[in-house]
């Protein structure tokens, strides 16, 4: 694990799941975007994770209340989605600002499956091949329910 990643974990008070740590160490996600999921806006991804998960200079934050939910971090954003990683079990959630619950749309069982599914859709589009159907993607990523299937339908159809 890189020093910046370790410092980000310490700052955020979490331990990144192994699948997340492996890919973050392997790839520079600082300026990476695929299928309308943007991981960073340039620069160091570990710094971006800290920025996304701390109160900003204007008091803005993605969570309600004083304290960020334990073990949850935003790791990417897209229009209109905010992507949450549960550092306790590795699950990935797609959250909309209007959702009453943070973790009611589990779109993948872990970061590697989520990343591979997004990359597969992106590569299929770039190579003008058939995009995998949402049901196949949902099965591969071990998505939670019909809400997750709705997310993958939208993602595969963009």
Residue ranges and their predicted role:
Residues 94-128:
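Compact, glycine/acidic-enriched structural inserts
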Residues 9-12, 100-103, 107, 141:
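Generic alpha-helical structural element
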Residues 1-84, 131, 145-158:
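A surface-exposed partner-binding patch
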Residues 79-81, 91, 101:
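Short acidic/polar mixed-charge low-complexity motifs
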Residues 30-34, 38, 91-93, 110, ...:
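Generic alpha-helical propensity signal that fires on short helical segments
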Residues 86-89:
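Short acidic-glycine loop/turn motifs at beta-strand connectors
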Residues 73-74, 91, 113:
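Generic structural signal for residues positioned in beta-strands
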Residues 114, 135-146:
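Glycine-rich, aromatic-bearing surface loops/beta-hairpins
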């Amino acid at each position: 694990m890189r020093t910046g990643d370790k410092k980000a974990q310490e700052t955020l008070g979490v331990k990144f799941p192994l699948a997340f740590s492996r890919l973050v160490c392997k790839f520079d996600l600082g300026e990476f975007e695929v299928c309308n999921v943007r991981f960073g806006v340039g620069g160091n991804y570990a710094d971006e994770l800290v920025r996304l998960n701390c109160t900003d200079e204007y008091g803005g934050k993605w969570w309600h209340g004083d304290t960020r939910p334990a073990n949850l971090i935003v790791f990417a954003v897209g229009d209109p989605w905010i992507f949450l990683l549960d550092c306790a079990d590795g699950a990935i959630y797609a959250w909309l600002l209007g959702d009453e619950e943070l973790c009611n749309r589990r779109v993948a069982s872990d970061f590697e499956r989520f990343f591979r599914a997004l990359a597969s859709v992106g590569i299929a589009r770039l190579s003008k091949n058939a995009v995998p159907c949402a049901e196949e993607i949902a099965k591969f990523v071990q998505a939670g329910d019909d809400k997750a299937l709705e997310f993958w339908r939208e993602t595969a159809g963009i």
